[in-house]
Amino acid sequence: MADAPRPKRNPNSNPSSSETVGNNDDLLNQILLYLPIRSPLRFKSVSKHWLSLITHPHFLHLRTTQPNPRPSGLFFYRYSHQIHPEFDFLSLLHYESPSKPPFKALTFVDDPSDLRILQSCNGLLLCRGLHLYIYNPTTSQFATLPQPPRRVLAPLRCYTTFYAYNLAFDPSKSPYYKVVSINFSWGLPDQYELDIFSSETGLWSPSADPFNGDVSFNPGVFWNGALHWISTSGGDSLYFNVDEERLETMPMPPIPDGWEERRLRYFGESRDHLHLIEIYGPRTTQFNVYAMERDYRGWFVQYRVDIDAIRNAFLEMIRSSLDPSDLHYYQFVILGLIREEKDEESFLVLHIPGKVIRYNFRNKSFRELFDVPRALIMSVFLLKVR
C-alpha cells in the first residue's frame, strides 16, 4: 500500500519554531554559544549556512570572550616507555555520565621523540618533543614552533641552555598566544634570560634584562596578563607581565608564628583568581587556601580546609611506617582547585593512594570521583574548553 501523501504547508501559515531558530542568526548564535564546543564543530556539516556561521570571526569572538570557564577535566599521565603514552581523563562536568575525552594520546603529530605536555593554558596545550608544539585538543589543530635562537654571551663566549618554556594565552583579549623561553647560563651573577615567541609574528625576540631568582619555572601559572613563578626558598616570587615585558617581585604569605618552614602544595589559577596552598609543620590535615590581590599587595585567606574526615574514611593515606612527626606522614596531593560561578560550590580535587576525591569548601563534604591505578604517575593537567 502506497504511503499517504504528506500535506503541503500553506505558504501563508506561521513558520515552525525550528524554522524560526534556523532563520535567525542572532538567536542561533546564542544557542550555539551555550553548547559544548564539540557540538558546534559537528554542526558545521549541517549546511553551508551553518558552516559559514560557526566559522565566522564574529561567532569565534563571542565564543572566546565568554566569562572565564571552569576546567572540563583532568588528564592523568600514564607511565609508559612508549613514544605516545596514554592519558586517563576525569571529567569535572559530568561525573555520572563521563564525557568522551578530547584525546587519549598525543598523536596529533608524528614526532620521533618522547612527546610530553609542558603546560595547559585556557584550552591550549604546550607540548615538547623534538620540537615545541601548541595543540588545541578541542579542534585537533596544532602549530609547530621554530626553535628559539641560541644566545652567545659576550665577552665570555658561553652559550645559554633552554631551561623551561611557559605559555601565555587569553582568548578574551587576543586570538594570539605567546610562549616564553627561560634560558639559563652557568657561572653568571644573573643567570636567567627570556625570549618570547609571538604567534602573531611567528618570531622569537629577546626580552627583559638578565635576572636571578630562586623560583620554579615548571610550569609558570598564567593569570592577570602575567606568568607567575613561585619561590622555592620562601623568598619573594616573581611574575612577568607578558605584553609589557616587565618582571616584578611577588610576596609570599608570612609563615605563622611557631613554624620555621613552608611546604608548597598547590599553585594555580581558577576563574580568574590566583591561588596558593602551603602547609606548615608536620602531620596536618588543616590548612588555608590563599588568593592573591589583583594589584599584588598580598595574599588573603580565601578558604579554610579540614580533611580530617577524609583521613578517617581512607586510612590508606596514612604512612604508618613513618613517625607521626614526619613531614610526609599523610599522603595526599592537591590536583586542582575549581572555583564555581557560585562560590559555595567551589571545591578541591585531591589524590590519595588509589583514589581521586572531591572536597567541598563550604560544608567540608567529600565524595570519591575516580579510582586511579597505582601505575599512573600523578602528572596532572587541567584542561579548559571554551
Question: In which residue ranges do the predicted regions lie?
Answer:
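N-terminal entry/capping and adjacent linker segments that precede and initiate structured domains
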Residues: 1-386
